[in-house]
Every structure is written in C-alpha cells, then in structure tokens.
Amino acid sequence: MSYLKTTMEDEESSKKNENDSNADSQCPSVGFFHKDHMQKSKTGDTCDLFPKWKILKEGKSSIREMIDTHTNAANIKLEQDDETSEKSFYPSTNTMHQTIPTEPNCTKQGEHTENINGNVHPAHIADKKLHKCDECGKSFKYNSRLVQHKIMHTGEKRYECDDCRGTFRSSSSLRVHKRIHTGEKPYKCDECGKAYMSYSSLINHKSTHSGEKNCKCDECGKSFNYSSVLDQHKRIHTGEKPYECGECGKAFRNSSGLRVHKRIHTGEKPYECDTCGKTFSNSSGLRVHKRIHTGEKPYECDECGKAFITCRTLLNHKSIHFGDKPYKCDECEKSFNYSSLLIQHKVIHTGEKPYECDECGKAFRNSSGLIVHKRIHTGEKPYKCDICGKAFSYSSGLAVHKSIHPGKKAHECKDCGKSFSYNSLLLQHKTIHTGERPYVCDVCGKTFRNNSGLKVHRRLHTGEKPYKCDVCGKAYISRSSLKNHKGIHMGEKPYKCSYCEKSFNYSSALEQHKRIHTREKPFGCDECGKAFRNNSGLKVHKRIHTGERPYKCEECGKAYISLSSLINHKSVHPGEKPFKCDECEKAFITYRTLLNHKKIHLGEKPYKCDVCEKSFNYTSLLSQHKRVHTREKPFECDRCEKVFRNNSSLKVHKRIHTGEKPYECDICGKAYISHSSLINHKSTHPGKTSYTCDECGKAFFSSRTLISHKRVHLGEKPFKCVECGKSFSYSSLLSQHKRIHTGEKPYVCDWCGKAFRNSSGLTVHKRIHTGEKPYGCDECEKAYISHSSLINHKSVHRGKQPYNCECGKSFNYRSVLDQHKRIHTGKKPYRCNDCGKAFNIRSNLTKHKRIHTGEESLNMANMESHSGTFQKMIYYEGGNSLDGTRMQMPVWEAEHAKSQRNQIEEKLYEYNNF
C-alpha cells in the first residue's frame, strides 16, 4: 500500500492528471458530468445541478476549462486541493452559462465527456498537448500544468512548515502536511468510520470495500484502482526512477519515496510513538513499531503457526519451510531466498557499510543493524519479559533471559541434560561440548564459539567502545564491562574476602583476589613455565615469547605488550591531557589517574600500615610501603639480578640496559631514563621557564612546582604533625618529619647496614662507599659528595659569612648559627632515651648512643677504606695518637694536621646527620 503516500506531493497529482487521457479507454472516470448540464440555463438562471457536482480525480482539468466558459469567472469560488483532488464549486446566482452548439458530424454527441472547450467537442482535442517543457520535452494540455511541472526541475520550495521546517512546492502540499502535526483527519469512510488526512487517501481506502480494480498491468497482470497507481507500478518493470535526490543522487520511482528518503538528510522524524516517544521518518515505520508495544503479530505462517509483526519477516521465515534459495552469491556460492538478502550479503565481500550512526560514527552493512545499534545510545528496550517485566534492547536478549524462569524448556542437551527455551540457544550451548569455534577474527585469527563473542573481540582492534558510563564518561567494549565499572560509582561490593575483608563487586573478582592469599597460580606458560594468578596476566606474558605488541603509540609508533604500558609511555609525549584537576590544574591522560590524584586534596587515606600506622590512598601503595619494613624486593632485573621494591623502579632501571631514554629535553635535545631526571636537568637551562612567580620573579618549568613554591610566600603549611604541632608545606615533608618521633629509618645501606629516614640521605651516604663526588667546585676543582657540602666550601672562596652571632662569630648558614647559639642558651634538645643525658647537636647524641649499644665508633681503618687519604690519625700541636702516646711535630706540620682533622670532622658530621 505504499502508493497511498503518493498523494503527499502536488507533483504526483499533476502526474496523475497528465496520464488520464491515455487511460480513458481502459479506466473509466471516477467522476464526470454531461455537457447537457451546461445547456440548462441560457439566460442567467441558476444552475441547480452545478453545486452538486463533485469532480473527482480525473476532473481537475475540466474545472479549469469550466472557469473559462463562465462569463463572470471572478464570482466563482474555487477550492482546489491538489493533494485531496476534491473540487467543489459554488457559483453565484448571476452566473451565465454558454450554449455549446453541436456539430452535425460529431459521433461523440450524447456521450459522457470530461472537457468542454468552446464550440469544439472535447473528444476531438483530448490528445492535443500544446504546452511543452524545455527541460525534459514533456507536453501538457494546459499552461498551468506546465508551470506546476517546471517546479520539479527548479527544485523551488517556497512553502515552509513552522513546526518541522519541512519545505513544499505548493501551499496545498503544506496544508496537507500540517495535518501530520495537528492530527486532523477530515475525510472519514462512511463504511467503516476510518479517517484520513487527504481525500485521495480516502478514495484509495474505499477501493478496499468495493474491490474494484479496473486498471490492469500488461506485464504481470496485477490490477489497480487507478491509472496513476498503474503508471507508478509500471516503473517496476521499466526500471524508471525519475525522482532523484539532490543530496546524494539516489533515484526513486515516485515522489513519496524521494520525500521519505530526504528525511535521512534533514533528520526530520514527524511520526512519534505515543507510548515510548520514539520518532520515525515515515508512518509505516511507526505502524510496525507500535506492534512491539501492542504485541500484535498479524502475519502468521500457515505451515507452523508462528506469527510475525511484518510481512517481510514472515516471507523470510517461510523460506525455511520451502528450502528454495534461487539467489546465489558468485563470490562464496552462498544461496538466498530473496534478491534483497543476496544484495545485503554481498556487502560482506565489498566491505561497504553505508549506514552510519550519527551519535558515534559506527557504520553498518544494513539499516536493521543501525536501528538495533542506536538502542545503545537511546536506552530503548522494546522487548519486555511477560513474566517479570524486565526489558531488553534485543529480542535475543529477551530469549536468553526467559531461560532463567522455571517452566518447560523444549530443547534439551543430550550431553549434559541442560534445557533451553529455543533451539538456537541449544545449538550455541552444544559448541561447549564439541569444542567447535566457528567464528574467526579476520585480524588476529582468534576463534570464538558464538558471533557475539567475536563482535566484542573485534572492538579491541577497531577501538570502538559503544558502552559509555553516564557518570564519568568512561567507555567500554561490552555491556558487562560497563556494568562492572558502574559498581565503582554505586559503591556496591557484596563479595567479601574472608582473609582480609576486602570487598568486590563480583564473585569472579573475589575468586581472583583470593589467589593472592592462597598463592595459587593456575595459569602456567607453556614456553617457560612461569605461572600467573589470572588468565589476563598469562596472555600479556605470552606476548614476550610471541613478540606481539598490539598496543601502539600513535605519536611515535612505539608498540607495547599491554595497555597499561602504553598509557605509561604516553605521558612522555606532551600531548593532550583532557582530565584536569580543578584544585591544582594538573592534567592527566586518563580519568582514573585524575581520580587517584584527587585523593591527595581530599586527604582520604583509608589504608593504614599496622607497623608504623602510616596511611595511604590505595592498597597498592600500602603493599609497596610494607616492603620497607619487610625489606622485600620482589622485582628482579633479568639482566643484572638487581632487585627492587616496586615494578616502576625496575622499569626505570631496565632502561640502563636497553639504552632507552624516553624523556627528552625540548631545549637542548638531551634525553633521560626518568621524568625526574629530566626535570632536574631542565633547571640548568636559564631563561627557559614558562611559569614565573609574581611575588619574587622566580621561574619554574611546570605550574605544579610554581603552585608549590607560592606556599613559601603565603606561609601556607596545611600539613600538621599531631605529635609536636609542627606544620609543613607538603605531605612528603610531614611524612619525613614523623620519622623523628617514630624513630623509623626504613632506608638501609647494603654496605654497612646504616639506616636513614629518607632515600636522599641513603643516596648521599652510599657515595662514601663508592668514592663518588659529583659536586665539583668551579674555583679550585675540589669535589664533594653532597650539594650542601659544596655550598659550604664555596663560602671559603667568597669569604662571606652572612649569619652573625652576638659573640661576634660568623657562619655561612642559618642552621649552623642555630646550632652554635645552643652553646650560649644551654639548650640541649637531643636526649638519650636510655640514660637521660642531653646534647646540643644530634651527632653527639648518635655518638653517645653507641656506648649503650656497644657499637664501635667509626674506626680509622674504615675511614681509610673510604677516603684512601690517611694512614693514621694525627692530632695537632702535640696531640695524642690513637694509642694515647704523645706526639711532637713542627708547627707547620701541626697546622697541616689540624686542616686534615677538620676535613675528617666535616665528613663525620655529614655522615652522622644522614
């Protein structure tokens, strides 16, 4: 019944009228009038027949000529609706009618006629078409028809709908269109009461009651009510498609097809479902959709009784019973019941995907695939379970769900006895027993038991993530992954670990976690025997053997075996970091890293160390920290067997062996193995900083360091020690400070066992063992193990000691002055816990403690092994040697000895301070 839509455009009605003269012989006119009626009044009498005339489809041209025959044409009111083809006349009382003389030789006298044209009988001029179109050569009887026709070539549409902005060629077309929005249906069938928007639709409908179909197709014998519909039908045989889309060039057999198609480009969907609000571009789409809600399935298979909502799906279904598949693919020889299915299938070989989603850009081979896909974005779930009311986006989803409910399940597996509601589900299940995996990925060759598994897998290669979290915007390749993720936002964690009481969203995640406690590693590598707690860990590991690196950086082309490695690598490139912290403006590549970072500002640290009570934001950080106490270093370098507490340190270390230096200076091009090394290096470039402090003019390389620096001026110290009340600008400084109270020294020297509160102290200390002195004086070429020692030394060359004591003594640094002042004040803040003795400097307390521990003080042999400069200890001006004997020496030698002693004391001071 698609021809019902043809009446929506005025050019269609003109097409109908144009073909009328050709169809007269075989298709009688629906409405007509006799010429004798025109002779009723010669002297101005009112025509009593005129108001009753209803000139139907083929009478439109007659009306125009009738106007010409009246002497007072201005008084005639013409209500002409091209769409409805209903013509009514209301002549005034003074309308004059002309007498039409008869011709003696006319054989058509006394017959019904359609046209009256002066003194010439219409039958003689029926075939004359005097008005020709310059564009296409088509001819028309009347100029008005030609003018109307020309609009098709110009494409002019002057009439616009206020509701949907749709445009039309004529006011009548617009008027009929507006009834879609208003819901007005003025034309009612007196047989069944059904109403229509246009008169022509009513006439078409009425033919269903009468059953009259007088216009027959010569090609196939099919009959129609009207010649215009027959003409449209004939284009199926001729292949003629005169209506072309100006946007994409697609052609159609009729204007209504073109009109509906154009809505794809305009996005117009005027037909709305009053149940769920979904909109459609055509009424037939809405009609079919409504059957989902009503459950109506009017098309029933006479073989098996199964019912369908559309005729097309019924026809597809029937092919199962017939087994007839006449349409064969010349590529793979697969056969189909219908040519349309073959055309759809061929797209697989061509790779063409003409149907694109306007939300995410995903393309599909057929419109049905696109329609189903769009439900992901709209959230539409039209398939509802009649038992529990749960709704689904796909009919297959509903079918799977129904198997949950108890009841008869006709399809039983002979292998395991499991039953299924549908045979398709049973067939899918059987592949578990047979091991059959017929669905192969054309990219990597991986096989799957079902098509849905392959579909999800393919998204790894395409990067498509259609399932988006409406809370944080993160996207996933499957619905189940999104569901797992949403548990984070809801805080739902019903599965609790009996070992450590940690909770999880899913039982599978809990099972995986428990293997940490049981140390179970069921997934073993066939190549090297290495075992893993989960399959994903094994998968990533196997890529080491195969050399596969599926995760490639689009910036530099470097590839990695895991996604996490790629994400870590991407931080090297100064590209886009879309996730910005609103507290400190620091930006991140992923939303997850931003969330982790935000916990710094919130101060949220729920994970506490049971040894030192230090708190952490994440369990992973707590686990890492605990290794400080246990001295566990599980990450071993496979090149040099050096061990590390965490994987990140091992990664950085491995770059020493590989020579990889991913962090490059954009000023001089020098590269480094770690980001921190690059930051340190950048400080050597003067005048290349981007972030300047407006208080003191000091410049920095990043906004983060500038923000940190500004706390100096603001005096902001948000991190307070609960033990002594001392405040710090940074949490890291507070953490270091707390170790004074706890006595914790987690950083232990591998050489001599000495422990330090922080890693920097250990780093400097180790240089005593290695003999490394990286800080050289540019004045005298003397070198030191620490930067502070170099600064102290440089004051010798400058001769400046800006920090003065009341006693007149001067010092290079405030810290040394503070230490000195304790001599005057008598303050001794460093107290021994064993005997209560107090000291003014920490190093003296450290030396004193060795009395209680029995630990020998640093002996000369040890010092010689580190410095390689002294053979024995010498005291100045006749001091005692180590064995207590008195030594005599010249004054110059004593001065030299004094200088050497000062150097050793400096070393001892540094050593004890660290």
Curated annotation (Swiss-Prot):
A zinc finger (C2H2-type) spans 131-153, 159-181, 187-209, 215-237, 243-265, 271-293, 299-321, 327-349, 355-377, 383-405, 411-433, 439-461, 467-489, 495-517, 523-545, 551-573, 579-601, 607-629, 635-657, 663-685, 691-713, 719-741, 747-769, 775-797, 803-824, 830-852. Coiled coil: none annotated. The keyword Transit peptide does not apply. It is found in: Nucleus. It comes from the Eukaryota. Expressed in skeletal and cardiac muscle. InterPro entries: Znf_C2H2_sf, Znf_C2H2_type. Keywords: Isopeptide bond, Metal-binding, Nucleus, Phosphoprotein, Repeat, Transcription, Transcription regulation, Ubl conjugation, Zinc, Zinc-finger. There is a cross-link at residues 5, 57, 60, 77, 87, 577, 738, 872 (Glycyl lysine isopeptide (Lys-Gly) (interchain with G-Cter in SUMO2)). GO terms for cellular component: nucleus. The modification Phosphoserine is found at residue 881. One of its GO terms (molecular function) is zinc ion binding. Pfam families: zf-C2H2 (PF00096), zf-C2H2_6 (PF13912). Residues 1-35, 80-101 are annotated as: Disordered. PROSITE patterns: ZINC_FINGER_C2H2_1, ZINC_FINGER_C2H2_2. Residues 90-101 have a biased composition (Polar residues). Belongs to the krueppel C2H2-type zinc-finger protein family. May play a role in differentiating skeletal muscle. This is Zinc finger protein 62. It comes from Mus musculus (Mouse). The gene is Zfp62.
